[in-house]
Amino acid sequence: MTMEPNSTTSDHILDWLEGSVSFFPSFLDEPCNNSGYIQEYHLWDQYQTDANTGSSPNATNSTTATIVATSATSTTSLEPCGSNNNQPLSDLPKKRNATDESSLKPPQNKNKRIKTRPMNEPENGDAVRKNKKGGAKANGSNCNSGNSKEGRWAEQLLNPCAAAIAGGNVNRVQHLLYVLHELASPTGDPNHRLAAHGLRALTHHLSSSSSSPTSSGTITFASTEPRFFQKSLLKFYEVSPWFSFPNNIANASILQVLAEEANITSRTLHILDIGVSHGVQWPTLLDALSRRSGGPPSVVRLTVVTAENDQNMETPFSKAPPGYNYYPRLLGYAQSININLQINRIENHSLQTLNAQSISASPDEILIVCAQFRLHHLNHNSPDERSEFLKVLRNMEPRGVILSENNTECCCSGCGNFAAGFTRRVEYLWRFLDSTSSAFKGRESDERRVMEGEAAKALTNQREMNEEKEKWCGRMKEAGFAGEVFGEDAVDGGRALLRKYDSNWEMKVEEKNTSVGLWWKGQPVSFCSLWKLDGNDQGGTS
């Protein structure tokens, strides 16, 4: 299926910043900044074509859609907590007024909260810890609840409840569920919200029903209207580096790989997108390609592998709502900056069965794989789908592979019992909720609720099988890849981007400069790594 962009050209992306630059005064002055990440948020407003126009997003089995634009003619502690380690109930937050039994959401006039210290008030008279970056401001939750477990009362209820479930202690389970129900709320500080999401997940686990936990009232990507989904996604990219940072590093890595190739202007750049950006990542890259000193590639092919409906419906951040279609906007923007862009969409196609033929790869093109936050859903036990897929990528002989993943331990049933896995899931969600409180400066917003509801799928999704960075690096090496050192542009650009966010965010360059990590309050969140074919590897095929 072929789609043509709007025939009217638009102003350059820099013109769309008019009236918006004041939001980022210091960042734009940075010598190594990647201003495209600011610009791209305003790109989508330029093309106000309905999100439902163009090709239908409804997937059919192993469907491939081709879309073309041309610049000329447009054809925690991981061990379960025992009861003797639990916080006394007298130390827990004061009981809230009764909540609605069905949704956990309290009435507007009954929204009692725990009285705590102001977010930046020191404990026991200690001085407030200085910001690591002098020019940055720490917003939202900046108390002792980040690096330390102190003050994180929701986990002190959720984790013992999971341990009681695993141990079959019915009385204790009932008691802790009751306390959680009294304290949980979808609004308020991160503890209240974590308690609400955790209570819903535990209830779902105990239920014999196979219905999705997201049907109980939580707002997620799939339940939103396409325009609001787009608005929420762009807002999140503006206020949090959770995804914008790895996307920034990935785009810089693509440019780094491209710079090492010859005859760029007469060749095709083919990007295999196995990610969760839903198009937000690519305007910045297209803009950078249009400004290359030697000119852009003759053709830029973007092959988007969407998440499978049957397998990844509950996978966080991977599925857009029905009707969401960013392709016309992206094609229109590419045309306006003289980039010959082609978009190929592969739907309902399992990652394990991808090959050079299914993505229509050709030997003379520059193939770069961008795999972000999707591969950890592949099984790593028996069968080991994860290692097998990396070998599939190796057999495609890409010029570069960018791997971005959550940097946390696996929480599947094969790597521990229910209590241990649930504790790790709760730890992941705490970091997300705590960081979004800072990102949105503690304000309630529908955009924040959508992102948090989507992240909360990690508590119930059985395909959420993370691995730490070291294990991922080992898998890549076993598959026949060698780590590539990040260039200065990628590292400096990442640091410059991070300066505009809360000072509790931190970037760490690791693994001999072949991995860049994103950390929140001293704890790892994700990593981004760059890989090339290992010249010493003689196998590679399977």
From Swiss-Prot:
Basic and acidic residues bias: start-end ranges: 92-103
UniProt-recorded name of the protein: Protein NODULATION SIGNALING PATHWAY 1
Extent of motif VHIID: 269-273
Region (Leucine repeat II (LRII)): 333-357
Region (SAW) residue spans: 455-532
Gene: NSP1
Region (Disordered): 73-150
Family that this chain belongs to: Belongs to the GRAS family.
Annotated knockout phenotype: Roots of knockout plants form few aborted and non-functional nodules under nitrogen limitation when inoculated with Mesorhizobium loti. Low level of arbuscular mycorrhizal (AM) colonization in roots inoculated with the AM fungus Rhizophagus irregularis.
Induction of the gene: Induced in roots after inoculation with Mesorhizobium loti. Induced in roots by infection with arbuscular mycorrhizal fungus Rhizophagus irregularis.
Function according to Swiss-Prot or TrEMBL: Transcriptional regulator essential for Nod-factor-induced gene expression. Acts downstream of calcium spiking and a calcium/calmodulin-dependent protein kinase required for activation of early nodulation gene expression. Acts as a common symbiosis gene that positively contributes to the early steps of the arbuscular mycorrhizal fungus and rhizobial infection processes in roots. Transcription factor involved in the positive regulation of the beta-carotene isomerase D27, which participates in a pathway leading to biosynthesis of strigolactones in roots.
Entry keyword set: Nodulation, Nucleus, Transcription, Transcription regulation
Localization per record: Nucleus
